[in-house]
Design a protein with these regions (language model features):
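Intein/HINT protein-splicing elements and their conserved insertion hotspots or analogous self-processing inserts
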Residues: 1-17, 21-22
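Generic C-terminus detector
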Residues: 2, 317-358
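Extended hydrophobic-aromatic, low-complexity segments
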Residues: 59-60, 76-77, 106-109, 208-209, ...
Length: 358
């Protein structure tokens, strides 16, 4: 049932504060005890792989990024469809982490089987109890997103982000990593349900911004560092539900080719939520404005936004977690572009909820 919402996708976007709270309750109470990992031999781990497809791959890129900030180990993130055929040196000293909403993604399952053949420790993050991924892995952590009916993932993705953040904190502890303040990080994560709720209250504003894209064939997303990972997911969502061609670029790469695509009235969606690189990103964005682009800017509360007409701000959160509220805004944008165009947002053409074929 849609519960009074127009679509399942909209309903599931609005369920995010609750399911994030449930996921956090399941995994960060009792000081990140995570008894599901009690048999993990951290002393053997000398490299970590995150392996996934699609939206789950974007969540895995996020996990790779934050774990690298805390742990001095080689940490990789590989698309499952590539992992199977690449020359990756997997052995008994490897931890392979597989992320899949359904737990039935064919390429991810094949990658898991390959890892087990090479004696790696395996851990899955999935939303479905008893799924193939869960049954075949040595260890499993569940997101608490509940059933997700819409093909385009929303609540499953944000619960993956928060669970992977919890997992990375736990792995940092197990692998002698350095976290500036674990208690602060946990407190910040506990604020995410309220932060996401605040973003959902910006729905009308994102619906207005969506009108900029209704007649566009192309859109360009840019960001740096974690913002780049967020725009990868934002571009995918826009493609999935509205059929607008969307590319995501590292902001610093604009001048190496993509800026040739920018002309009058081109729509650029830009993220600048990372304090260490925000000003450089703003400089890159202004280059697109100078060429006539219309820019939708998602940024932090204190960022100077002079020169931009379409601005939305996220609350003050730790920069490592800013992608969570930013992602919700990008979901809303994609949703309302699709609605304006009359697309079937719950069942986009040519897509399946669970990709069980290679």
């Amino acid at each position: 049932q849609k519960g009074g919402y127009d679509t399942f996708m909209q309903k599931e976007m609005h369920e995010q504060p609750y399911v994030i709270k449930e996921t956090l309750r399941a995994h960060i109470e009792n000081d990140l005890a995570m008894p599901e990992l009690s048999g993990l031999d951290a002393s053997k781990i000398n490299q970590i792989y995150f392996v996934a497809c699609g939206t789950a791959y974007h969540a895995s890129l996020y996990a790779q990024y934050i774990l690298r900030t805390w742990v001095d180990l080689p940490i990789y993130c590989i698309s499952a469809s590539e992992f199977r055929y690449g020359n990756y040196r997997i052995d008994e000293n490897t931890l392979c982490i597989f992320v899949s909403q359904s737990g039935e993604t064919a390429d991810t399952l094949a990658a898991l089987k390959l890892s087990k053949e090479n004696k790696a420790q395996t851990l899955s993050v999935t939303n479905v109890l008893g799924s193939s991924l869960a049954r075949l892995s040595d260890f499993v952590l569940y997101t608490c997103a509940g059933p997700e009916i819409a093909v385009a993932s929303t609540k499953a993705y944000t619960t993956q982000l928060v669970l992977l953040a919890c997992l990375c904190l736990k792995l940092a502890s197990l692998c002698n990593g350095v976290v500036e303040s674990q208690n602060h990080m946990i407190d910040q994560l506990k604020q995410m349900p309220e932060v996401v709720e605040e973003m959902l209250q910006q729905e009308d504003k994102m619906a207005e911004f969506a009108k900029l894209l209704t007649d566009q064939k192309d859109a360009y997303f840019i960001g740096r560092q974690l913002d780049y990972l967020s725009v990868l997911e934002g571009a995918l969502k826009l493609k999935e539900v509205s059929y607008v061609h969307a590319d995501a670029y590292m902001a610093g790469e604009l001048k190496h080719g993509p800026i040739a695509l920018i002309e009058k009235d081109t729509v650029v969606i830009a993220l600048a939520t990372q304090p260490s690189v925000a000003q450089k990103t703003i400089s890159n964005i202004l280059e697109t404005v100078a060429r006539g682009a219309k820019v939708i800017l998602i940024t932090s509360k204190n960022q100077n936004t002079e020169g931009f007409d379409y601005v939305i701000r996220i609350p003050d959160v730790n920069p490592l977690f800013s992608c969570i509220p930013a992602t919700v805004l990008l979901q809303e944008l994609a949703y309302y572009v699709a609605k304006e165009k009359g697309c079937d947002v719950d069942k986009p053409r040519n897509l399946a909820k669970s990709v069980t074929v290679e």
